[in-house]
């Protein structure tokens, strides 16, 4: 989430948002993983800019417990919002569209409002998760498109 938020908020220059990514990675500093992270950064930015909208958040797959996937999605949204805020300059945030501001508010609410303990393993809970995941995916694509005018806008 931190890498995608940084890309959506300001681009591939990670100087401002790398500390958020380091925090998300835990104990290992970026330097130890820089080649892999640079490759992942390039692939992620290509997916965000792809006119076929191939971007997918990196989250646990369907074989994992739903509660674990819900927690991972909440953590992804939290890291996204933190990195976006770190990457976007204050003046640029003031010029943000109302829709972009609402999307960031929604992602913040998802980060703080998803309760994995309230999720069972039934089809309704799985469907709810998939709908939230798709919203997050489209929100990231829209936020990227707003900050990168050459990218296609998804909008809704």
Listing of model-derived features with the role each one plays in the protein:
Residues 2-77, 81-156:
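Domain-length accessory/inserted modules outside core catalytic folds
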